[in-house]
Amino acid sequence: VRAVKRRLIVDGEITEFLQNRSTAAELGVKNNGSARSVDFNREPIIRMSNTFVEPGDHTVEELIKEVRHGIYFKSFTEWNIDDKRLNQRYVGLEAYRIENGQLGTLVKAPVLEITTPALWGSVRARGKTVAFESATCGKGDPMQGIPVWTGGPDTLLGGVRIGSR
Protein backbone atom coordinates (compact mmCIF):
# COMPACT_ATOMS: atom_id res chain seq x y z
CA VAL A 1 0.00 0.00 0.00
CA ARG A 2 1.41 3.34 -1.01
CA ALA A 3 1.93 5.78 1.85
CA VAL A 4 0.21 9.14 1.48
CA LYS A 5 0.37 12.50 3.23
CA ARG A 6 -2.01 12.51 6.17
CA ARG A 7 -3.44 15.62 7.81
CA LEU A 8 -4.62 14.26 11.13
CA ILE A 9 -5.79 17.58 12.60
CA VAL A 10 -6.92 20.62 10.60
CA ASP A 11 -8.04 23.83 12.31
CA GLY A 12 -8.28 22.01 15.63
CA GLU A 13 -10.49 19.17 14.36
CA ILE A 14 -9.46 15.54 13.91
CA THR A 15 -9.85 14.83 10.20
CA GLU A 16 -8.24 11.44 9.77
CA PHE A 17 -7.07 8.39 11.69
CA LEU A 18 -4.16 6.10 10.89
CA GLN A 19 -5.42 3.05 8.97
CA ASN A 20 -4.23 -0.28 7.65
CA ARG A 21 -6.08 -2.53 5.18
CA SER A 22 -8.10 -4.22 7.90
CA THR A 23 -9.20 -1.14 9.85
CA ALA A 24 -9.94 0.83 6.68
CA ALA A 25 -12.20 -1.96 5.38
CA GLU A 26 -13.92 -2.34 8.75
CA LEU A 27 -14.59 1.41 9.02
CA GLY A 28 -15.42 1.90 5.34
CA VAL A 29 -12.65 4.45 4.75
CA LYS A 30 -9.62 4.63 2.47
CA ASN A 31 -6.44 2.87 3.61
CA ASN A 32 -3.77 5.51 4.17
CA GLY A 33 -0.78 3.17 4.42
CA SER A 34 -0.09 3.58 8.13
CA ALA A 35 1.11 0.05 8.99
CA ARG A 36 4.80 -0.84 9.08
CA SER A 37 6.96 -3.51 10.64
CA VAL A 38 10.57 -3.59 11.75
CA ASP A 39 11.32 -6.72 9.69
CA PHE A 40 9.75 -9.16 7.23
CA ASN A 41 8.98 -11.66 10.00
CA ARG A 42 7.01 -9.24 12.19
CA GLU A 43 3.38 -8.21 11.97
CA PRO A 44 2.87 -4.73 10.48
CA ILE A 45 1.48 -2.40 13.15
CA ILE A 46 -0.46 0.84 12.69
CA ARG A 47 1.93 3.55 13.81
CA MET A 48 2.97 7.14 13.31
CA SER A 49 5.17 8.08 10.41
CA ASN A 50 7.05 11.36 10.12
CA THR A 51 4.79 13.61 12.18
CA PHE A 52 4.99 17.37 12.54
CA VAL A 53 3.06 20.57 13.02
CA GLU A 54 2.87 22.61 9.82
CA PRO A 55 4.46 26.07 9.84
CA GLY A 56 2.56 29.30 10.30
CA ASP A 57 3.27 32.92 9.44
CA HIS A 58 5.24 34.29 12.39
CA THR A 59 8.88 34.70 13.34
CA VAL A 60 9.95 33.52 16.80
CA GLU A 61 10.41 37.16 17.79
CA GLU A 62 6.82 37.96 16.77
CA LEU A 63 5.51 35.03 18.83
CA ILE A 64 7.47 36.16 21.90
CA LYS A 65 6.23 39.77 21.53
CA GLU A 66 2.64 38.47 21.86
CA VAL A 67 3.28 37.09 25.37
CA ARG A 68 2.63 39.24 28.44
CA HIS A 69 3.69 36.61 30.97
CA GLY A 70 4.93 33.13 30.04
CA ILE A 71 7.71 30.65 29.39
CA TYR A 72 9.59 29.97 26.15
CA PHE A 73 10.49 26.26 25.92
CA LYS A 74 13.46 26.34 23.53
CA SER A 75 14.18 22.62 24.01
CA PHE A 76 12.90 19.69 26.04
CA THR A 77 14.58 17.22 28.37
CA GLU A 78 11.59 14.87 28.37
CA TRP A 79 8.12 14.47 27.02
CA ASN A 80 5.64 11.64 27.27
CA ILE A 81 2.05 10.78 26.54
CA ASP A 82 -0.11 8.04 28.04
CA ASP A 83 -1.29 4.95 26.14
CA LYS A 84 -4.71 6.52 25.51
CA ARG A 85 -2.95 9.54 23.95
CA LEU A 86 -4.87 11.87 26.27
CA ASN A 87 -2.55 13.10 29.02
CA GLN A 88 0.87 14.46 28.15
CA ARG A 89 3.80 16.06 29.92
CA TYR A 90 6.64 18.22 28.61
CA VAL A 91 9.67 19.28 30.67
CA GLY A 92 11.83 22.13 29.40
CA LEU A 93 15.60 21.73 29.08
CA GLU A 94 16.44 25.24 27.89
CA ALA A 95 13.61 27.60 28.82
CA TYR A 96 13.27 31.33 29.44
CA ARG A 97 10.82 33.55 31.27
CA ILE A 98 8.88 35.98 29.03
CA GLU A 99 7.67 39.27 30.49
CA ASN A 100 5.89 41.87 28.37
CA GLY A 101 7.14 40.41 25.09
CA GLN A 102 10.80 40.19 26.17
CA LEU A 103 12.90 37.10 26.89
CA GLY A 104 14.22 37.09 30.42
CA THR A 105 16.09 34.75 32.73
CA LEU A 106 16.53 31.01 32.38
CA VAL A 107 13.85 28.86 34.04
CA LYS A 108 14.83 25.51 35.55
CA ALA A 109 12.77 22.52 34.35
CA PRO A 110 9.37 24.09 33.65
CA VAL A 111 6.61 21.50 33.20
CA LEU A 112 3.55 21.58 30.96
CA GLU A 113 1.01 18.88 31.87
CA ILE A 114 -2.00 19.00 29.58
CA THR A 115 -4.61 16.89 27.81
CA THR A 116 -4.53 16.47 24.05
CA PRO A 117 -7.73 18.48 23.42
CA ALA A 118 -6.50 21.27 25.71
CA LEU A 119 -3.10 21.35 23.97
CA TRP A 120 -4.48 21.68 20.45
CA GLY A 121 -7.21 24.03 21.65
CA SER A 122 -4.60 26.36 23.16
CA VAL A 123 -2.62 26.95 19.93
CA ARG A 124 -2.71 30.67 19.11
CA ALA A 125 -0.01 30.95 16.41
CA ARG A 126 2.78 29.00 14.71
CA GLY A 127 6.22 30.09 13.59
CA LYS A 128 7.50 30.10 9.99
CA THR A 129 10.53 27.88 10.57
CA VAL A 130 10.17 24.12 11.01
CA ALA A 131 12.86 22.06 12.77
CA PHE A 132 13.00 18.27 12.79
CA GLU A 133 14.63 15.69 15.03
CA SER A 134 14.91 11.94 14.83
CA ALA A 135 12.79 9.75 17.08
CA THR A 136 11.56 6.18 17.37
CA CYS A 137 8.00 4.92 17.26
CA GLY A 138 8.02 1.87 19.55
CA LYS A 139 5.11 -0.57 19.58
CA GLY A 140 4.29 -4.24 19.78
CA ASP A 141 5.19 -7.36 21.69
CA PRO A 142 7.95 -8.15 20.97
CA MET A 143 8.85 -4.46 20.70
CA GLN A 144 9.27 -3.00 17.23
CA GLY A 145 11.09 0.32 17.09
CA ILE A 146 10.84 2.17 13.77
CA PRO A 147 12.78 5.38 13.02
CA VAL A 148 10.65 8.48 12.40
CA TRP A 149 11.08 12.25 12.30
CA THR A 150 9.12 14.66 14.48
CA GLY A 151 9.09 18.40 14.74
CA GLY A 152 7.43 21.63 13.87
CA PRO A 153 7.69 25.35 14.34
CA ASP A 154 7.81 27.35 17.55
CA THR A 155 4.18 27.41 18.66
CA LEU A 156 2.41 29.97 20.83
CA LEU A 157 0.01 28.45 23.36
CA GLY A 158 -2.42 30.57 25.35
CA GLY A 159 -4.27 29.94 28.60
CA VAL A 160 -2.09 27.03 29.79
CA ARG A 161 -0.56 26.59 33.25
CA ILE A 162 3.14 25.86 33.65
CA GLY A 163 4.46 24.12 36.75
CA SER A 164 7.88 22.96 37.86
CA ARG A 165 9.55 19.72 38.82
Task: Say what each PLM segment does.
Residues 1-165:
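N-terminal small-residue-enriched
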